[in-house]
């Protein structure tokens, strides 16, 4: 086998891993949901209340917390500004619901400190990419030309997009850290072992890593 072919095959392998990364994150998320997902918050508040408490403590009460019925809810909209929560999280009283709502409030804190950056725009692009890449891959496979080179270029693009997504994820980690600290300072996490709390905030981060799968037609069909 020629060295060039070996390199292309290696690129394709890493590209395949990049494309599978959101699904792998989703599988890890589901495992945590199965283990800890039924744990209710001891303090008894819901996702809406948790987000509002963080916003009030962060002195940004002007940020709304809205219940959203659209398919792709659960995001922070800096233009309004508002936190959009799905009904399950808005009314939810599970520890995971609270952590998810709190992480979005953490993005509002980043916005307050001018550290939000372009995360919202990037996430919208990742949803678009997650919907488009399977169709693009099929189109490339049925096209004429040199398929190995075409696949190599495609997987190189896929790997680059995934790498940038992981780099952007630093903002999500920071938002989760801010949310964790705010809830802890408000003593809303009292009564929960550290293992449960860590799992809840890990899930909020996995939500973001799994975004190109969960918020696409593939996620709707196969999860």
Segments from the language model and where they lie:
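Hydrophobic alpha-helical transmembrane segments
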Residues: 2-13, 144-157
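Generic low-complexity, intrinsically disordered sequence content enriched
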Residues: 23, 59, 140-141
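Polar-ligand-bearing catalytic/cofactor-coordination segments
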Residues: 26-130, 166-223
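Residue-level signal for the membrane-embedded core of alpha-helical transmembrane segments
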Residues: 129-132, 154
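Short, structured loop/turn "capping" segments at alpha-beta junctions
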Residues: 116, 134-135, 148
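Alpha-helical transmembrane segments of multi-pass membrane proteins
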Residues: 17-21, 157-168
């Amino acid at each position: 086998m020629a060295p060039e072919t070996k390199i292309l095959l290696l690129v394709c392998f890493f590209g395949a891993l990049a494309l599978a990364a959101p699904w792998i994150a989703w599988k890890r998320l589901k495992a945590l949901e199965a283990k800890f997902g039924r744990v209710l918050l001891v303090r008894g508040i819901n996702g809406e209340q948790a987000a509002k408490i963080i916003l009030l403590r962060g002195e940004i009460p002007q940020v709304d917390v809205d219940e959203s019925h659209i398919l792709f809810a659960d995001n922070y909209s800096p233009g309004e500004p508002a936190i959009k929560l799905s009904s399950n999280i808005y009314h939810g009283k599970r520890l995971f619901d609270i952590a998810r709502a709190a992480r979005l409030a953490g993005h509002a804190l980043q916005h307050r400190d001018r550290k939000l950056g372009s995360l919202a725009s990037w996430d919208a692009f990742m949803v678009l990419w997650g919907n488009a890449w399977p169709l693009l891959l099929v189109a490339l496979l049925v096209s004429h030309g040199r398929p190995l080179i075409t696949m190599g270029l495609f997987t190189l693009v896929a790997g680059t997009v995934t790498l940038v997504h992981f780099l952007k994820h630093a903002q999500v980690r920071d938002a989760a850290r801010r949310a964790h600290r705010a809830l802890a300072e408000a003593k809303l996490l009292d009564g929960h072992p550290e293992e449960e709390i860590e799992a809840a905030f890990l899930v909020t981060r996995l939500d973001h890593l799994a975004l190109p799968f969960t918020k696409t037609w593939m996620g709707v069909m196969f999860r």
